[in-house]
Design a protein with these regions (language model features):
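Active-site segment flanking the S-adenosylmethionine/decSAM binding pocket
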Residues: 135-170
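S-adenosyl-L-methionine
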Residues: 1-31, 35-36
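Active-site regions of enzymes building and remodeling cell-envelope glycoconjugates
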Residues: 43-49, 148-151, 194-207
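Active-site flanking residues adjacent to catalytic metal/cofactor-binding acidic residues
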Residues: 27, 49, 139, 153, ...
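Short, glycine/acidic-enriched loop or turn micro-motifs at the edges of active sites
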Residues: 31, 53, 143, 157, ...
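Short, polar loop motifs at secondary-structure junctions
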Residues: 31-35, 121-122, 187-193
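Long, positively charged, glycine-interspersed low-complexity recognition regions
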Residues: 165-266
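Class I S-adenosyl-L-methionine-dependent methyltransferase module
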Residues: 42-142
Length: 266
């Protein structure tokens, strides 16, 4: 379903890269709508935590077989008034039926191309078998107390629209924490401090820009001191992300068109 800052469009290539590592336990401290963790090998021990309690409650309900209803505008108003994070319907209405997946944004039921309420419901039903064994926890990344071989962080992006209760997110504190982790760690963000290496980027086709007028670009960062620990046979997959060769030329042409329009991307 729609979730501001979600990784649904890039979840499979990101998960494919992580799954090629020799680790067997995985943690997402900002699991969000669980797009990436759902694509990770089910044989791995997978942990997903988040400070957005309503999403954790929703994911826990979905993994046990709960099927969300179609949220009407009237139902959404009632859910918003109650705003009960322990009701799994709350997150469906709060994000899945909101404009662009923003927390309690304008109600979005359907357009000429898509029924958003139905899409949210169907997406969650399809998600259920993929997250059945995931251990979800409502917690801040600092206090989660979870240990894993590989950590993937998708924190709220700096200087972009906030998600849920994360508008006061301390970015400096996060990077300090990430730089001290002994586990392999990867981060998606617009930029990173010294000591981090960008290994991939993609211009997101979202139909709107960041607050500063720039296009949103997804970037994956790895710690420079940890590079030797990543699978060194994956240089090609890091560069072109294991894409079907037939798609590479199309992507290169699209990327060239974007760069000609907005300037060379970093």
């Amino acid at each position: 379903m729609m979730y501001l800052g979600g990784k649904a469009t890039v979840a499979k290539p990101i998960a494919r890269f992580f799954a090629a590592q020799t680790t067997r336990s995985y943690w997402e401290p900002f699991v969000g709508a669980a797009s990436v963790i759902a694509e990770m090998p089910p044989s791995w021990i997978r942990y997903g935590s988040d400070l957005e309690q309503s999403m954790i409650i929703l994911l826990q309900a979905v993994q046990t077989g709960w099927k969300p209803p179609l949220v009407t505008e009237r139902m959404r108003c009632q859910l918003r008034e109650k705003n009960d994070p322990l009701d799994p319907c709350t997150a469906v209405a709060k994000f899945g039926c909101s404009f662009r997946g923003c927390a309690w944004g304008g109600y979005t039921y359907k357009s000429a191309k898509q029924n958003f309420a139905l899409t949210a419901r169907n997406t969650l039903i399809k998600l259920a078998p993929k997250i059945r064994d995931v251990i979800f926890k409502f917690s801040d990344y600092l206090t989660a107390g979870i240990s894993a071989d590989l950590i993937y962080c998708d924190p709220p992006y700096k200087d972009t629209y906030s998600v849920g209760c994360k508008s006061d997110f301390n970015h400096a504190q996060f990077w300090e924490w990430a730089s001290k982790q002994e586990s392999l760690i990867a981060v998606t963000e617009r930029s990173a401090p010294a000591g981090w290496v960008k290994v991939w980027y993609k211009v997101k086709n979202q139909g709107f820009k960041n607050r500063d007028g720039t296009y949103l670009v997804e970037r994956l960062w790895l710690r420079e001191d940890q590079l030797p620990r990543w699978n060194r046979d994956l240089k090609t997959s890091v560069r072109c992300w294991n894409l079907n060769p037939l798609l590479v030329d199309r992507i290169r042409k699209k990327r060239a068109m974007v760069e000609n329009r907005i300037g060379a991307l970093p």
